[in-house]
Design a protein with these regions (language model features):
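Surface-exposed extracellular loop regions of Gram-negative outer-membrane beta-barrel proteins
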Residues: 2-34, 42-48, 57-102, 123-139, 143
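Outer-membrane beta-barrel channels and translocator barrels
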Residues: 11-14, 54-58, 101, 111-115, ...
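Transmembrane beta-strands of outer-membrane beta-barrel proteins
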Residues: 16-20, 47, 61-63, 117-119, ...
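Outer membrane beta-barrel strand-and-loop segments of large Gram-negative receptors
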Residues: 1, 97, 112, 116-166
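Transmembrane beta-barrel strand/turn architecture of Gram-negative outer membrane proteins
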Residues: 41-59
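Residues on the lipid-exposed face of transmembrane beta-strands in outer-membrane beta-barrel proteins
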Residues: 3-9, 49-53, 106-110, 121, ...
Length: 166
């Protein structure tokens, strides 16, 4: 189930867009060989925001924020313990949350009939990435998952296009 609400505004040289998406996901797992089952539900709000400014008829500046979600799959959520190796057991975590990746970017663009330039700077980060971790309890290696991952990324890009035809 999903719903989206958005708003767009333009005033002279300034433009903007804002949006928010709501997503509800329900997972239900039944095992054929066992009398076991579990379910998981996710409710996520996913915002986006963009501002633009027309510097000149052929030049613009844009800044934006976006969020992306990655929901955990059944394997990550499955609470039942795999004991096929009694010295190293594994199980999922039904309390996992959706992983949320945030992205901020600024872009300058200039274009003409002969030459196009785009310069972008992007910063993205995740504070609750789904990661596997292990620990020893009572002499047994336990492996499971949690929202403990963190990452940051900075990206600079330059795009040049030259039209060589007369």
């Amino acid at each position: 189930l999903a719903a989206y609400l958005g708003y767009q505004l333009k005033y002279k040289k300034l433009g903007g867009k804002a949006g928010i998406r709501y997503e509800h996901t329900f997972m239900d797992a039944d095992y054929k060989n066992k009398d076991e089952k579990f379910d998981a539900q996710f409710d996520d709000l996913v915002p986006s925001l963009m501002f633009s400014y027309q510097l000149a008829p052929t030049q613009s500046l844009r800044a934006s924020y976006n969020m992306r979600i990655s929901r955990p799959g059944i394997w990550f959520l499955n609470p039942f313990t795999d004991t096929s190796n009694p010295t190293a057991i594994s199980y999922g975590n039904p309390d996992l949350e959706s992983e949320k990746a945030h992205s901020l970017s600024v872009t300058f663009g200039s274009f003409s009939q002969k030459f196009n330039v785009n310069v972008s700077a992007n910063y993205s980060f995740v504070n609750n990435g789904i990661e596997q971790y292990s620990f020893i309890k009572d002499g047994v290696m336990n492996s499971t998952y949690d929202n403990i991952g963190k990452s940051k990324n900075i990206n600079l890009s330059l795009f040049l296009n030259w039209n060589m035809s007369p």
